[in-house]
């Protein structure tokens, strides 16, 4: 509601076909309203709204409002590792759980990851990505690995954020490139689903090389 945008959720059988006891208290979360320069009338729907004005608000304000809300409420978090790490792994949703499982298959826990110079970033809002939070996490990294199945929404935003950075590499769909097999080994395909064993095999190979 803060940004006036629709919110979409990608659901998977691995999570929706499960049961759990949850806390339904509406006050269990304390949301922060960020400082943001709103246009006249705010960002939500109103009477006598023209397509031109709707488009202008979308492009000039709404994406940035959603990003500001994400940053203020820390939807994306550094989970493992600390500043000074050299390898960063970013993932969201089920892929985040798969990464944790994959790390356990490699016998790497939080302490071992810190010793090896590895940091993990859990993304709660995949678009728009909290660029300020991402840059804070990625500072000093030599390599960012994006574990993401299907369409590469997070990877594209990260590569855009680091476009002019010649020191940091980004691996995702492919190893060291964009679309197309000529850009290197395929790591995390856009077809099918990823699983912890596949991810562990790819991450293990990268860790050995690095």
Regions found by a protein language model. Give the residues of each.
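Flexible, low-complexity linker and terminal segments
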Residues: 1-210
């Amino acid at each position: 509601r803060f940004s006036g945008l629709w919110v979409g959720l990608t659901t998977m059988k691995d999570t929706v076909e499960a049961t759990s006891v949850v806390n339904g208290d509406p006050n269990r979360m304390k949301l922060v309203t960020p400082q943001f320069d709103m246009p006249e009338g705010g960002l939500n729907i109103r009477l006598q709204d023209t397509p031109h004005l709707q488009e202008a608000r979308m492009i000039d304000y709404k994406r940035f409002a959603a990003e500001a809300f994400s940053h203020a409420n820390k939807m994306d978090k550094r989970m493992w590792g600390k500043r000074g790490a050299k390898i960063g792994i970013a993932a969201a949703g089920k892929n985040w759980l798969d990464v944790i499982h994959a790390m356990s298959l490699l016998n790497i826990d939080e302490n071992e990851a810190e010793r090896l110079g590895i940091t993990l970033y859990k993304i709660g809002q995949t678009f728009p990505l909290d660029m300020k939070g991402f840059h804070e996490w990625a500072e000093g990294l030599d390599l960012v690995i994006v574990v993401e199945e299907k369409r590469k929404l997070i990877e594209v935003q990260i590569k855009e954020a680091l476009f002019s950075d010649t020191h940091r590499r980004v691996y995702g769909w492919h190893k060291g490139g964009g679309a197309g097999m000529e850009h290197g080994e395929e790591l995390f395909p856009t077809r099918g689903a990823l699983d912890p064993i596949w991810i562990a095999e790819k991450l293990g190979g990268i860790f050995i090389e690095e």
